[in-house]
Amino acid sequence: GELPDKAIVQFGELKVGITHGYQGKGSSTPDRAYNTFIEDQVDMIVFGHSHIPYKNYINGVLMFNPGSPTEKRGQPYFSIGLMTIEDDSYDVRHVFF
């Protein structure tokens, strides 16, 4: 079956938007991912498309691209993302290899 353009997952108080990142308006993949959820009041957006690791905030929303374990796209390392959620706190980081 076909996957939706976006999904929202709730982990306790943490509201996470998930999208591929190619759709939407904006000049960059992070901007397009952000604009996909602009009306959803999410805390974090996890996106892909570019295969380039990214971790930054846009208007208070944590934007995270885990990168790629199979295609570096000019980056020095392959990467994956690791998310840890405990009670009211969370951490998201890249693992490079």
Name each region found by the language model.
Residues 17-20, 43-49, 64-66:
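Active-site neighborhood of phospho(di)ester-bond hydrolases with catalytic His/Asp-centered motifs
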Residues 60-61:
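A short helix->loop->beta-strand "cap" motif at the edges of active sites that frequently abuts
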Residues 15-17, 43-44, 55, 82:
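Generic alpha-helical hydrophobic packing signal
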